Structures are given as structure tokens and as C-alpha cells.
């Protein structure tokens, strides 16, 4: 596969994962926790695909500059790394929404 297509696969998978993470956050705000968790799982699958492609590029390069570094490659790396961070934060925020929903339910039961 041409390098441009490989790099676009990283970008597409990372962007899809990011969209799924934000969808999970929107669902968590409405207390749709099961659906939010499913979106996070789907995001993880997309990230795994992107990371596998990244790993293959690193292996092909062997630290010797065999894979040409282009601006679009840097762009793909940026998408991947920021999406990994977004996925980690979304996972924590969904957990926080679940925790807060449980605390609110306890308060309502007490009154």
C-alpha cells in the first residue's frame, strides 16, 4: 500500500475514534452509560487499528529513516496521539458521570 494511503488509514481511524469518544461523553451526560461504554469500546478498536499501522511503519523504518517523513505523516501522528489522550480522558469522564449519578441517586433516596 502506498505511504499516503497508509497514513490516511491512521488519520481515518484516529478521527473515527475521537468522534466515538465525544459521542460517549454526550451519552454519559444523559446517563446512557451502557451506550457510552459501547462507544468507548468502539473507539478503542479504532485506536488499536491506527496503532497497529503506526507500529508497522516504525518496524519498516527500523530507526534508519527508511520511511520518508512527510507533513501528512506528522499530521497523522498528531491525530493519533491527541486521540489517545481524548480516549483516556473520555473513559475517566464517563466513569465520573457514572459515579456522580450514583451519588445523586443516594441523595435522592435519603430525602
Tell me what each language-model feature is.
Residues 1-111:
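Terminal alpha-helical segments
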